[in-house]
Swiss-Prot record:
Signal peptide annotation: 1-22
Gene Ontology annotations of biological process type: neuron differentiation; positive regulation of neuron differentiation
Note: Non-classical progesterone receptors involved in extranuclear signaling are classified in 2 groups: the class II progestin and adipoQ receptor (PAQR) family (also called mPRs) (PAQR5, PAQR6, PAQR7, PAQR8 and PAQR9) and the b5-like heme/steroid-binding protein family (also called MAPRs) (PGRMC1, PGRMC2, NENF and CYB5D2).
Full protein name: Neuferricin
An annotated Gene Ontology molecular function: heme binding
GO cellular component: extracellular region
Location of the region described as Disordered in the Swiss-Prot/TrEMBL record: 220-249
Length: 263
């Protein structure tokens, strides 16, 4: 019962996180009266140099005063290229050239967009929000453009994917592994393997995921009902061993918690 409740708590927290983030997105990107709007040429004056009015940068169209982190963004500093502009793409690509320091995020994946959103959370927490940048993400009236609406949808999609990944990790925690030139490789399961604390150990199995080139080792519960049939009283008491996406390791006993493969 503790195991089932624990998984339920994890999933409930994940769902709650998505709901809370939806509220944050509305607050960040929705209408806000009296907000300051910057034109690109105006923001370009805020590079932190002598005589400049300040040190600002923009991310996904939101402008932040980064004066408190001046040593990172002032002229000559490592991240000086971000100052006075929206260089959203470079937060993901790491391309700090003039060609890379742009706000064009076309072609980025949902996970990369989610990384941008995580950066946005960082700036929201550590720096002062001062306005919005008119252009790719905000219109002249300060409201989101269709491109920013697409970003919001991708953030939601990325969060849902993370939620699914967390659910999968609770069901099939990654194995512990080690390799040495003297002993070869070893895979094993414990109650903490994969960073997932639980009341069962499990046995190593290959898990094949759709689209993945290679399987990876996961720990599989060997008793009780399948994870997707917790309320079925007529289960075979094999845990998740009968999952069709799993395969035993050749040369390893089916119920061994450790599989060793000498050289």
């Amino acid at each position: 019962m503790l195991r089932i409740c624990g998984l339920g708590v994890v999933l409930s927290l994940a769902v709650a996180a998505v709901a809370v983030m939806a509220v944050w997105l509305m607050d960040w990107w929705g209408p806000r009266p009296g907000i300051r709007l910057f034109l690109p040429e105006e923001l370009a004056r805020y590079r932190g140099g002598p005589g400049d009015p300040g040190l600002y940068l923009a991310l996904l169209g939101r402008v932040y005063d980064v004066s408190s982190g001046r040593r990172h963004y002032e002229p000559g500093a490592h991240y000086s290229g971000f100052a006075g502009r929206d260089a959203s793409r470079a937060f993901v690509t790491g391309d700090y050239s003039e060609a890379g320091l742009v706000d064009d995020i076309n072609g980025l994946s949902s996970s990369e967009i989610l990384t941008l959103h995580n950066w946005l959370s960082f700036y929201e927490k550590n720096y002062v929000f001062v306005g919005r940048l008119v252009g790719r993400f905000y219109r002249k009236d300060g409201l989101p453009t269709s491109e920013l609406t697409q970003v919001e949808a991708m953030v939601t999609k990325g969060m849902e994917a993370n939620e699914q990944e967390q659910r999968e990790k609770q069901k099939f925690p990654p194995c512990n592994s080690e390799w040495s030139s003297a002993k070869g490789s070893r895979l094993w399961c414990s109650q903490k393997s994969g960073g997932v604390h639980r009341d069962w150990i499990g046995v190593p199995r290959k898990l094949y995921k759709p689209g993945a080139k290679e399987p990876h080792c996961v720990c599989v519960r060997t008793t009780g009902p399948p994870s997707d049939q917790q309320d079925n009283p007529r289960h075979s008491n094999h845990g998740d061993l009968d999952n069709p996406n799993l395969e035993e390791y050749t040369g390893c006993p089916p119920l061994a918690t450790t599989c060793s493969f000498p050289l």
